[in-house]
Amino acid sequence: MKKQVSLLTLTAALLLGACSTYEEVPATSGDGATAVGFLADIAPREQSRADINVDFGTGLTGTWNGEDKLGVLANDFSKLLQFTYTTDSKAFTGSLFGSAGTWAYRAFYPHNGNATVSGTTVTVPFSALRTQNGNKYNSEFDIMAADAITHNNAKPGKTPEGNAVKFNLHRITSILALKLQGGAASEKIASVMLTSKKPIASEKLTFTVPSDPNATYDPSAITPKLVVEGTSAMGSPISINSEHITVTYADGTAPSADYSETFFNVLPDDSYGDLTFSACTDKGNAASFTITRTTPVVANWVYTVERTAPFTKAAAPTVEWIGHEDLTTPTELLESGNSADIRVSAPGGIKSMQVDITSSVLTTPMEGSEQNLLEAVKLAPSMELTNPANNDMAAALAGFGFPTPAQLLNQQHVYFQIGGLIDMLAMVCAEVTETTNSDFKFTVTDNAGQKTVITLKYVKTVVSPITYNNDADLWANTASFTLNIPADATSVSVQYRIKGQTTWN
């Protein structure tokens, strides 16, 4: 195959559907449930995923496997069911409740337990962080929707003729397939990142599942969309989409840097423009190149890129506190809505990330307790984010918006928001009687051992309501003071007393 230098090429993957045979599954006893086995084939030019391969010449090949799970809605479209592929029966098996009559079905793939349905809208994960097993394709984000089906006078899971219901699935995404060479055989690929100028991933993706059994499949009616905003554990809005997709590897499966195959499921787009592929090794060496795609990327198609690129020592990590160019002057704490958005770029892959907190209000034991506030919420003054001290700390860190170890290790780009923790700091500082400083120092180390440090500085300034101007005149028997009057004050009075006396004047 001709090597592609500047353009993604379209591989017409002319694939045969996975023609499954069906064996009757005995019904479970009790509960009124009927054991059902659904069949599922893929529309032409797609393949029945799971065990799937791209040979960069003929396209996709593969079969369903025992890890594949189908999301099914049957009559009660508010109840999402999960059917798991069984290799013995070559069908997706599960249970339906009901008797013979009219049965209407909707289905999608995959349903790994995190999907939800509201009406005809399905929400599934479409994460920026993905894992491959070596050079094998990962089917977790290969989203498909089935044509709607309705059968009258039929038993659950059957056609009127008594055959198993078969879903015809349509792939919603496009597949970008990268074959990369040029690194040292002695090094392992730590991660491969795809970067676009527009969002290409999100914690949540929504699409419309077909609902009219008489309608021809219309890709434009599926309307897949990336969800832009979510809510943090502290209740504040956070961004959940990303312009990056990063692939890392299951333990012990990372391919050698001299040859790797990486796959990215993305949504169709009329013109992605610049697409950058960046790879790094476990030794901190990196390779990167950009291609330009100005023609449409279409659902159901595989687009392949083959490249030999030099791997050289990566640039040191950079850490950015977004919106804060001056890191020497502390930022005044607000009552709420404090911003703490952090962007980390590590071309060599992150090996470790530590945060050190210096704050008297967070680290001093609370009144009537031996614990300080950090300890009370399962945190500590010094924490290794890539290896939290215990499960409680790991859960607490995630709750406050810190990235998890999986979101850090070998990643080349990390974005996180910890404004909720800073809002908690502001709540505590509302009670202080003197100016208080709090520092959050982040230390990022990449796979090459290069370190970058950044400190987020916050201050709660407490202004005295009355300040002596240090201008006493003993001869004139006078002195002056400056009052700091709140803007919402309705009346102001000043009292004084002579030293040694108890009466205020």
Q: Model-found features: residue ranges?
A:
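Acidic/polar, low-complexity intrinsically disordered N-terminal segments immediately downstream
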Residues: 22-85, 301-375, 379-380, 462-489
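A short beta-strand micro-motif common to beta-rich folds, especially ectodomain repeats
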Residues: 436-447
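C-terminal motif of bacterial Sec signal peptides marking the signal peptidase cleavage site
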Residues: 16-18
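C-terminal edge beta-strand
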Residues: 451-460
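Short, low-hydrophobicity acidic/polar segments
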Residues: 23-188, 248-249, 257, 278, ...
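Short helix-loop boundary/capping segments
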Residues: 160, 168, 179-257
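Recognizes extended acidic, P/S/T-rich segments that occur
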Residues: 497-505
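Conserved structural position at the C-terminal beta-strand
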Residues: 109, 279-281, 444-446
